[in-house]
Amino acid sequence: MTAAAAAGEIPAEDAPPPGALYSFGTPWPEFNEGISYIDTFRCADAGATTTLIEFYSTSYKSSAPLPGWIKRIRDGQITVDGEVATDPDMILREGSKLVYHRLPWQEPFAPHLLDVLYEDDDMIALNKPSGLQVLPKGLFQQRTVLAQLQLKDWKMPSSFCSKRKDAQSHPVPVHRLGRGTSGLLLCAKTKLAKAQLAAYFAEGATNAGKSRDETDICKARKISKFYRALVTGILENDEVMITQPIGLVRYPGVAEGLYAACSSGKPAMSKVRVLERLKIHNHTLIQVEIHSGRPHQIRIHLAYIGHPLVDDPLYGIGGQPKFDEPEPTSTADSFAYDGGYERPLQPVPGDCGYHLHAHWLVLCHPTTNEMIKITAPLPHILQTREEQQDTAKLLGG
């Protein structure tokens, strides 16, 4: 199988880093275009009346406090049936179409360049940098991997388009990586590949919840994912299997809840292998193979066994958030910054700083069924001493 790169993606003087076929990316504009939220008003009680401010302050209460929604309404950010509504006490009619336009804002810094590690007619594998979100959410609506995939001109031969009726206009990610996590991200070019790859990841999560021998689970999987991580403390055992369930807990600043170690959560399985014990720093370099793909699974599992990732701002020992008490925020300041949304002052899942890299994976190709391996080059801090020496030799150091 070939992994052909598009010729001339970048100038020769800007050659991609070792291990990459080519790089692409469009610099971010200073401000995004804002975003619109559309609702159709339905009255639960025919005898009751609901005002505009009541609707938004209850339906979107995690977005802003009551004064925040009053400000948005008076600033003309909401329309009702196509007309700007500036009266918070306006009575809503059944079936009214409500549109809230979140004003353009300057999103926090995020890298924009992506390295292509593998590419064929069905899928593409990217090396995602730390600090770049995969899909739009919260403050990051434009500065995402998905946006870069949409911005790139994916030139495909007409013969390919005619043969592949399921071809998509651009590749789409088929799994998650945390914003602070770097490394391998698989994206599908066709609807068939998307469905097949998504099924592989879902199958892993399902198998993690079954009482089966580890060897049987490994044989059943169509994809195996391996990460590198740097954790606090010295792990005594060379290998550790973690099976702590992961579920949602209440957490200020995260409306849908925060994923954490939770006895009532969903099954999750992580296999940890020690690579080096860095006793002078009281750190351990590890490889983690995940048999499921729960959100923030590695961060939670390592914290659960008493070895949080080095510099993880959110998860502490026990796999729980380090902070759980609400903090006062300045409504006026938050509106000025991001068009009306409050920035949580406490750490949230998207905050960076920890050292976690999706290093390599082996998968059954979604159309050929061939087993292939793809590797993302390691950051220096996540290399073993021997790997660092080998890298220095390659670079002529």
Swiss-Prot record:
<protein>
    <recommendedName>
        <fullName>RNA pseudouridine synthase 5</fullName>
        <ecNumber>5.4.99.-</ecNumber>
    </recommendedName>
</protein>
<comment type="similarity">
    <text>Belongs to the pseudouridine synthase RluA family.</text>
</comment>
<dbReference type="InterPro" id="IPR020103">
    <property type="entry name" value="PsdUridine_synth_cat_dom_sf"/>
</dbReference>
<dbReference type="GO" id="GO:0000455">
    <property type="term" value="P:enzyme-directed rRNA pseudouridine synthesis"/>
</dbReference>
<feature type="domain" description="S4 RNA-binding">
    <location>
        <begin position="64"/>
        <end position="114"/>
    </location>
</feature>
<dbReference type="Pfam" id="PF00849">
    <property type="entry name" value="PseudoU_synth_2"/>
</dbReference>
<keyword id="KW-0694">RNA-binding</keyword>
<dbReference type="GO" id="GO:0003723">
    <property type="term" value="F:RNA binding"/>
</dbReference>
<dbReference type="InterPro" id="IPR006224">
    <property type="entry name" value="PsdUridine_synth_RluA-like_CS"/>
</dbReference>
<keyword id="KW-0413">Isomerase</keyword>
<dbReference type="InterPro" id="IPR050188">
    <property type="entry name" value="RluA_PseudoU_synthase"/>
</dbReference>
<dbReference type="InterPro" id="IPR006145">
    <property type="entry name" value="PsdUridine_synth_RsuA/RluA"/>
</dbReference>
<dbReference type="GO" id="GO:0009982">
    <property type="term" value="F:pseudouridine synthase activity"/>
</dbReference>
